[in-house]
């Protein structure tokens, strides 16, 4: 059972006639105090050099939000950067922020380089807070064996064994090459983010790129990952794929086609053999889809589905236009799910409405 309860806005530019400020790429976490934090990127355009991570906080389970401010001051760095990080609350109460930043030596170039089909170079970074996200250590660069930047666009997870795991595809180098291949990399830390390895592959299949990878743990050592599968050779977006591990991420299954023609997606464990997933569908019948999944015998079997945002959800924009009228020009993505307790969950995503980048959350009730 999936029930839509209500929607709220985390960030919307209060003065769009004065400043160009857009919100993108949210990530939610629930602190041990019960307070929620939302990381998101704010900048004047989608690939603007001044895009950087901000933090908002909620004391009422996501109904209202207060902007805390910038995650850190990246103007101190020797090279201009823009960054995107996501929070994870550890069992001991510490908060880990993990993500990546692009090096923007030429502010007139975008992140993607059309001439080569490559991307700006970058660094994978991690930071820690021991006061519920009010103060953070200076982001530390994570050494990696791959020359390509790892797309750690989702949060890391803390497994029941105490390890931290994160997933990512590889961005091509600025010259358009990818010497490591079209693979998915698992990053592992045994010491709460102090050191990391990136020598395990969670995905290596038919030269398909596993963008926007997300991971969750079910029973101890049983992991499931979902990806936005992209075939660069044919420029085709394939249905979301999932792969699983039963040994703590050391080895992984071949990917399974879910049949859901989504792009950025995410998933969480509800207990037993049940997962909940959320998908950005941007082609046929666009919108945000939430599904309950029976993952018995490590096979993907949808048992319930609900569109929580999009034309068929009956959503109306602020100007009264239906989503069916707005979706021709609407952009949205990077959805995620957060368990609030009991049968309540919060879904987050970004959207561009009336030319403005917003961060939205939706309260749901779900039962297996």
Located regions from the model:
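Asp-box/BNR beta-propeller blade signature and adjacent active/binding-site loops
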Residues: 1-368
């Amino acid at each position: 059972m999936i029930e839509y309860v209500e929607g709220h806005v985390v960030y919307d530019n209060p003065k769009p006639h004065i400043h160009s400020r857009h919100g993108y790429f949210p990530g939610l976490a629930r602190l041990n105090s019960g307070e929620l934090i939302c990381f998101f990127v704010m900048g004047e355009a989608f690939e603007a050099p001044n895009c950087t991570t901000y933090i908002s906080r909620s004391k009422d389970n996501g109904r209202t939000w207060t902007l805390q401010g910038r995650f850190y001051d990246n103007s101190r760095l020797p090279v201009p950067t823009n960054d995107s990080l996501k929070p994870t609350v550890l069992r001991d109460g510490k908060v880990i922020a993990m993500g990546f930043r692009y090096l923007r030596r030429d502010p007139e170039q975008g992140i993607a380089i059309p001439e080569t089909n490559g991307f700006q170079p970058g660094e994978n970074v991690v930071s820690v807070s021991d006061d519920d996200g009010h103060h953070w250590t200076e982001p530390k660069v994570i050494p990696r064996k791959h020359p390509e930047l790892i797309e750690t666009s989702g949060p890391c997870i803390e497994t029941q064994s105490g390890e931290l795991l994160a997933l990512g595809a590889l961005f091509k180098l600025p010259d358009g090459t990818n010497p490591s291949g079209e693979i998915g990399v698992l990053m592992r830390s045994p010491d709460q983010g102090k050191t990391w390895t990136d020598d395990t592959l969670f995905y290596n299949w038919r030269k398909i790129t596993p963008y926007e990878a997300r991971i969750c743990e079910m029973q101890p050592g049983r992991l499931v990952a979902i990806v936005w599968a992209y075939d660069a050779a044919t420029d085709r977006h394939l249905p979301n794929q999932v792969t699983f591990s039963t040994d703590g991420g050391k080895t992984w299954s071949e990917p399974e086609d879910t049949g859901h023609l989504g792009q950025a997606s995410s998933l969480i464990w509800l207990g037993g053999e049940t997962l909940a997933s959320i998908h950005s569908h941007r082609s046929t019948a666009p919108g945000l889809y939430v599904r309950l999944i029976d993952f018995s015998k490590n096979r993907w079997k949808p048992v319930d589905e609900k569109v929580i945002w999009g034309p068929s959800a009956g959503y109306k924009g602020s100007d009264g236009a239906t989503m069916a009228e707005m979706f021709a020009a609407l952009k949205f993505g990077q959805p995620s799910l957060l368990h609030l307790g009991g049968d309540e969950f919060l879904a987050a995503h970004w959207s561009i409405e009336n030319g403005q980048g917003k961060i939205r959350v939706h309260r749901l009730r779900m039962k297996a």
